[in-house]
From Swiss-Prot:
One of its GO terms (biological process) is cysteinyl-tRNA aminoacylation. Monomer. Its cofactor is Zn(2+). This is Cysteine--tRNA ligase. A motif ('HIGH' region) lies at residues 29-39. It catalyses: tRNA(Cys) + L-cysteine + ATP = L-cysteinyl-tRNA(Cys) + AMP + diphosphate. It comes from Helicobacter pylori (strain Shi470). Binds 1 zinc ion per subunit. Its EC number is 6.1.1.16.
Length: 465
């Protein structure tokens, strides 16, 4: 298994800290609004990583957090006259619903920052005791990055650009020093009583503390195997996480760092701050979650994905082929490539090489369909073909529906009944040799984007886009 390590900037063999076990931490959302397609892409990318590792024989523990203490949450809660707990719980539920619709496996653990305040305070106290952290006059506590000789080694950032983004605090020793603890500033602020005084943790300390309490190994030079997240988190968030872990515990946070690429809308990075977010819940109004998942996984996870609906509909053809084969093989079958599972898994073991994996998948679908055409009554290999389809489901998280359900997506129960009534009316017309009426019914349904197919078992129908 090979993965691309952001820190080394190259593909490297995956060699876990404990043989055949992988512990992964993925940065989750800050829950002040609904999740957008950028969040979906990150969740799907590392869901693919998890599935690939599991099918390669690894025992995987994947932790994905919720940041439920943050300035954006506080500001929106004040605006909506809610507590931060009320507001964050709304968006945690929304995010969970969205990811369920995208068939993303539930993490082993989903810690909330608010549940680990003691661990955060303890880590800050350690940094103060080591004289690596310092307090300024307003009570805020910062980490002195000059005490970490490896600061910047992960992101290799452009300091003139990135440090300007942090903002200037006059009492900071260095511009890149980052806040560990924000003291309580008054009635419109949120604070928790602690040995550090009333206040709340900074963003970066939250993830490091949750990793330490939920995943970290002892007696190893790294706390976890893989730390993952979106490319926008590389600096300052992941750089600062790595720094404070080295400073507090004397070990590296993660052996490997993995980052997924952006989702662009009109060639601009999609983000809430830019106001061009495409929320998952809105996309799900137009497209089934499996169709969205299939599209978002179709571009290599490190590449930028330029979202457009034309490409989404083109990618749906791949799903159609999977379900068309599944539909055929449930009744008949032919020969298949016996090495299919091995070949597609090897593609994913090469830094999740999805384009190569999808090429193997396309080849299998085409060759199997050709053999079904040549020998439609051969049932000897039915179990093996269905096993291959099941393997696709487990590896890529697609192809898990019944074919009838898939091809009738987007049609309500009452609409289905109307279509069935029309099919029955057409059947009677054909029996009465009124072929003009039968053709008119077919054309009428085609205008509603309903295609009819006559089979030996009767007429079946599909919704098309």
């Amino acid at each position: 298994m090979f993965i691309y390590d952001t820190k080394l900037k190259q593909k490297v063999p995956f060699e876990p800290l404990v043989e055949k076990k992988a512990n992964i931490y993925v940065c989750g959302p800050t829950v002040y609004d609904d999740a957008h397609l950028g969040h979906a892409r990150s969740a799907i990318a590392f869901d693919l990583l998890r599935r690939t590792l599991e099918l390669s024989g690894y025992e995987v523990v994947l932790v994905r957090n919720f940041t439920d203490i943050d300035d954006k949450i506080i500001n929106k809660a004040l605006k909506e006259n809610k507590s931060i707990q009320e507001l964050s719980s709304i968006y945690i539920e929304s995010y969970t619903r969205d990811l369920n619709a995208l068939n993303v496996k539930k993490p082993s653990l989903e810690p909330k920052a608010s549940e680990y305040l003691d661990a955060m305070v303890g880590m800050i106290e350690t940094l103060l005791e080591k004289n690596i952290a310092y307090q300024i006059s307003n009570g805020d506590i910062y980490l002195d990055t000059s005490k970490d000789k490896d600061y910047g080694s992960l992101s290799v950032h452009n300091s003139s650009i990135e440090f300007g983004r942090i903002g200037l605090v006059q009492e900071k020793r260095l511009e890149q020093d980052f806040v560990l603890w924000k003291s309580y500033k008054g009635d419109n602020d949120v604070g928790f009583d602690s040995p550090l005084g009333k206040g709340r943790p900074g963003w970066h300390i939250e993830c490091s503390s949750m990793i330490f309490k939920t995943l970290a190994l002892t007696d190893t030079p790294y706390q976890i195997d893989i730390h993952a997240g979106g490319a926008d988190l590389l600096f300052p968030h992941h750089e600062n996480e790595a720094c404070q872990t080295r400073c507090a515990f004397g070990v590296e946070l993660a052996k490997y760092w993995m980052h997924n690429g952006f989702v662009n809308i009109n060639n601009e990075k999609m983000s809430k701050s830019l106001g061009n977010s495409f929320f998952i819940k809105d996309a799900l109004k137009n497209y089934d979650g499996e169709i969205l998942r299939n599209y978002l996984l179709g571009v290599h996870y490190r590449s930028v994905l330029n979202f457009n609906e034309e490409d989404l509909l083109m990618s749906k053809k791949r799903l159609d082929k999977i379900y068309r084969l599944k539909q055929r093989v449930l009744g008949t079958l032919g020969g298949i490539n016996p090495n299919f599972k091995k070949e597609i898994l090897e593609c994913m073991q090469d830094d999740l090489n999805i384009s190569k994996a999808l090429s193997v998948l396309e080849s299998m679908l085409s060759s199997t369909n050709e053999k079904l055409d040549q020998n439609p009554k051969n049932k000897a290999l039915k179990g093996e073909i269905l096993a291959n389809l099941k393997f696709i489901e487990e590896l890529l998280g697609i192809g898990f529906k019944d074919p009838v359900e898939y091809f009738q997506l987007g049609v309500s129960g009452s609409e289905k009944q109307e279509i069935e009534n029309k099919i029955e009316e057409r059947k009677r017309a054909k029996e009465q040799k009124d072929f003009l009426k039968a053709d008119n019914i077919r054309e009428e349904l085609l205008k509603q984007k309903i295609a009819l197919m006559d089979t030996p078992q009767g007429t079946i129908w599909e919704k098309f886009f």
